[in-house]
Each structure stands twice: as structure tokens, then as C-alpha cells.
Amino acid sequence: MTFFEIHNASVWRGDTEALRDFSLDLRAGESTAVLGPNGAGKSTFLKLLTGEVRPEAQRGTPCRLFGEELWALEELRHRIGVVMPEEVARFEPGEIAADTVLSSLRGAYGRTRDMRFSQTDKSRALEAMELMGVAAIRHRPFGELSSGERRRFLVARALVHQPEVLVLDEPSTALDFSASLHLIVTLRQLLQQGRTLVWVTHHPGEIPPEIDRVVLLKNGCIFADGRKRDVLTEKVLTRLYEVDLKVRWSGGWCDVRFQ
């Protein structure tokens, strides 16, 4: 089943054509990495996926999410959980870490901001924090957490909605080795639950072994799309980054180095 589809669309950001003649289908139950250098169009793609921007020009079928036109129903976008690095700045240093997860439920499912959280809400928040390995530190102030701990709380904040699709924007940024390993374990659990993951990054070495499809972006266009080992080759990556690169594989990880 295809959960996101767009065909022959263009998106402008000011005077720049951020996405040009852009076509992409994403399938439910399939983990996908979207990879590209700075300025490739990754951020614009994310905004398109979450309904924050619309194509200025489009030929063919409209942009669809779960089979419906993306901007037709607001609730469609609630079926996607998005983790963005800049979300960290939204929270006060003194805010209790667990409250950052619970607060994600404000406004969801018709709630108003002054409604109290039910025991079900609290149980779901605790489950999400346990899944991310941060339940033991949930009573600490957010400002006292390490960068990696904050990132895991952000993922828990997205998971508390039990989304059908989880989008991770540069998820390995600021994560230490231990936190990165925990995130990989969590990805396996999410995949076993049938969740769909979209992993957006600028570095091929950050794509975990669980990802089976890679989409490369360059200058607002699809540069390559296919199975990971078919796409992440020395020839393709050298053309993508315009520098000679050496690729080695180890345990499903792609190790990329300068020639």
C-alpha cells in the first residue's frame, strides 16, 4: 500500500526551485532513507510530506497521503509523527521531561489546552518513554538532559500518538554511541510492529542496517532511488557529492571515506 504519492510537482522557496518535477511514492511497512547534501531539497520534501507547503506547479495526480488529497483533511497529517532537531528549542529548561511528552497530546483528538490528561494518556506517554529508554529520567528538568537524552524524548513525544508513519529528520545528530545503538534497537521494534519509517539524513554512514530503500536527492530532484546496496555505491555517491569517495560495507552499515 502506498501511503504518500506525488507526481511531477515543483515547489519554490523564494526565488529558488527547491523541488523540481518531483515524483515519489512511499509504501507502508517499508523503511526508507532520504539522503542528500545540504540544499538538496530534503527539508522541503519534509514540509511537503507533512502538508506545510504545497506545490506551485504540478502535472498528473495531486499529492496524496493515505489515499486522500494531502490538504483535504487535517486529521490525515496527525497520522504522521515527525521528529525535527529544532524542536528542542521549544521547551523551557525547567520543564519536566515527562511533560514534554504529555504536552504533545494537547490539541489532539479534539482536546482543548485546559483538559487534564487521563490515566490512558499517562500510560501511553510512559510506554513511549520506556521504548526510548528514558523513563528512568522522566522527572528530571529538560535543561539538565544531555543532547542525546533530549533527542530520545523528542522521539517519545512523536510515538505517544501511535502514528502510522514516523519521520526522523537527522535522527543521529547529537546522539552518543550508546544512544545511537538504542535508537537502532527501537527501529527494529517499530518495524516489527508494522510501522513505516522515513529517515532523512545528509550522511550515508548514518543510515542503519534496517533501512532497505534509499532515495537520493540533488538540486531538488530525485537523483537515485532503489535498494540500499544498489544506490550507495562509490560511483553514485561520488556523482552525488562531487568528490571521490571510497565505500565499504560492514554489518549492513555503509562506511564512506575520501579517496
Which residues make up each language-model segment?
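Conserved catalytic motifs of ABC-family nucleotide-binding domains
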Residues: 162
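Conserved ABC ATPase "signature" region
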Residues: 102, 117-137
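Catalytic Walker B motif of ABC-type/P-loop ATPase nucleotide-binding domains
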Residues: 166-170
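Conserved structural motif at the start of ABC-family nucleotide-binding domains
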Residues: 4, 18-21
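ABC ATPase nucleotide-binding domains
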Residues: 238-259
